[in-house]
Amino acid sequence: MKTINFGNFNSAFTLMQVFNTEKKCIRYLESKLWKNSEPVSPYDPTSKVYRRGDGMYRCKNTGKNFNIRIGTLFEGSKISLRKWFYAVYMVTCHTKGISSVQLSKDIHVTQKTAWFMTHRIREAFKQDYKEKFDGEVELDETFVGGKNKNRHWNKKAKKCQGRAFVDKVPVMGILQRGGKVFCKVVENTSYKQLTPPILCKVKHSATIYSDEWQGYRLIPKVYKYHVVDHGHGIYVSGGAYTNTIEAFWGNYCKRAINGIYNWVSRKHMQRYFNEFCFRYNTRNVSINERFAEAILHCKSRLTYNKLTA
């Protein structure tokens, strides 16, 4: 199939100029998801495929019709690919993401539809343990939730000093210096919750840095381990520090939550951190490369029933 040069785009405006028709969006998806843009049946990858006159394809072995949307987050959606591309761009390439309210205004859909679209996109960035971290690795946790002082007197949480944030959701982070970050929403910050993700995600040859929290007490038994004693005002000791992951919490997570999303529920929080991690992990590539990477992740589909279950 003849290849198309889609050019470069570095803003939402130029994105819409490049993808000014639905056909161009389809061709772009085919170029990214199918090798050499040659159609592959989602029902039988070994089958011969026939091209129909209406833009659909037919799988010879199963007799089923399909298009590039099948098997992606765009499957079953009545929203045009142009609007989907805009949503993907804003969620992944915009500095702090975009709220469902603003997205609904931008692409003229209901807030409910925009909310569903953004969560489908975040679900596509679901994190796994396949890519192991090595070298110098920082560990830390953050807590997401409103400030206790801002709550009505009868809704204030008791006993929420130190790490006993009973009113907040804990999120653990694992960051490889000069590389990527991995985040997981956990039930609490005990060693039983923090240790398994570390063992799964970090190679035993790595050197780990964290603060003095007892939730990491088993780490020295497996890894070369250095502690930064924040409790005594020590934040850097030679190469021992957790400043990188703390900067990630502030610049990529808290700015988006406080500035755009305002409130994030525990139920959906992991998806938001999928989004934050994706932006951080693609921080050194161009905007159109980041967009292309986002499209490559769009091979899964979150249903509305699962989202709201």
Predicted regions and their residues:
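Residue-level recognition of single "structural anchor" positions
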Residues: M1-A309
